[in-house]
Amino acid sequence: MTDILNYTKSEEIFSAAQQLMPGGVSSPVRAFKSVGGQPIVFDRVKGPFAWDIDGNRYIDYIGSWGPAICGHAHPEVTTALQEAIEKGTSFGAPCVLENKLAEMVIDAVPSVEMVRFVNSGTEACMAVLRLMRAFTGRDKVIKFDGCYHGHADMFLVKAGSGVATLGLPDSPGVPRTTTANTLTAPYNDLEAVKKLFSENPDAISGVILEPIVGNAGFITPEPGFLEGLRELTTENGSLLVFDEVMTGFRISYGGAQEKFGVTPDLTTLGKVIGGGLPVGAYGGKKEIMSMVAPSGPVYQAGTLSGNPLAMTAGIKTLELLKQDGTYDKLDLITSRLIEGIIQSAENNGIAINGGSVSAMFGFFLCDGPVRNFNEAKTNDAELFGKLHKEMLRRGIYLAPSPFEAGFTSLAHSEEEIDKTIEAFDESFNAIKK
């Protein structure tokens, strides 16, 4: 494959950005800290492709970190947005589009009987934690090592995503009193969760988790794990919360809870439901959601919540996803991609394990299986950094971190998958010891 060697404009722009923004970026993982080198600066995106400011084209497997499941700048989405923007960018008042997207979410997601729109996944998780505590009258919450629920103080305990990428223990500026009620357990370890419940009787408001971990790499639940959490929370009068910001509408139309047949009490959403615009949502049983203001006493608000542009993009995206055969195609191309990646590594004598669920995939450069964050950390991060550079040179844009899942879209064709597997084969050959 043709090598990309010219990053002159990207380097100039990023150099200037470092004087203007912390680390030169608006979100830490974009800075390429864990893979080395300087980040490329994007100019435009379309379908499965991204172009940098130097004119280089890449096959993109980040998809704006998950929202672009229909492909970048899908014509039906952009046309709908062009029509909507003529009516205004934000109302700060109720609009009919909120009703329509709410109905679509409620119809699709098994746990959701009522929904509140916010502006990000972090906001959704912050609000849902407050709601968990208010509904149960309990302060403690259980999360899992490596699971990421946004950058709110109470969740920055053994968190994944950028915290894992940068090797940070947690974050300075978070008082111990803020996280004192946040308990942690290894993912896929039911016994550890049972122990926390026994040590904290009648004190745990609930358990929150990514049903498929995507912010500590790609880790799937062991058989019986989600079912076991459902039983434990019910037995202890606690709530079960699925953070489906990443998995919602990506691994099936009804998310992970539909895919695995386990229904939580509350769900957080984001990414896909905004079609590429800033959005978040949380929802669940009516008796719980009725506690949210103004119906109830649990306060939460947002200036741009439910704005017409995000609602428009979300509605059109979900309409596209609901078409026949959508998830069959995503299953097919993504499983073929990860099988090709694994085969390429094995052909070159490189330890690897990985997998996929519909339009979400990931791999670790280590012997497997990987069932939790501790095992994920055995991944060869240095080798991944070399792989990332080789793939970038060959026009393949992977997440610049070994602790992030990858994403496919409806715009990725067999041709893009073939080229990507070829690039992996060449890159593994280039970095093998």
From Swiss-Prot:
Its main location: cytoplasm. The modification N6-(pyridoxal phosphate)lysine is found at residue 271. It catalyses: (S)-4-amino-5-oxopentanoate = 5-aminolevulinate. Its cofactor is pyridoxal 5'-phosphate. Pfam families: Aminotran_3. GO terms for molecular function: glutamate-1-semialdehyde 2,1-aminomutase activity; pyridoxal phosphate binding; transaminase activity. Pathway: Porphyrin-containing compound metabolism; protoporphyrin-IX biosynthesis; 5-aminolevulinate from L-glutamyl-tRNA(Glu): step 2/2; Porphyrin-containing compound metabolism; chlorophyll biosynthesis. InterPro entries: 4pyrrol_synth_GluAld_NH2Trfase, Aminotrans_3, Aminotrans_3_PPA_site, PyrdxlP-dep_Trfase, PyrdxlP-dep_Trfase_major, PyrdxlP-dep_Trfase_small. It is found in: Cytoplasm. NCBIfam families: hemL, PRK00062.1. Belongs to the class-III pyridoxal-phosphate-dependent aminotransferase family. HemL subfamily. This is Glutamate-1-semialdehyde 2,1-aminomutase. It comes from Prochlorococcus marinus (strain AS9601). The gene is hemL.
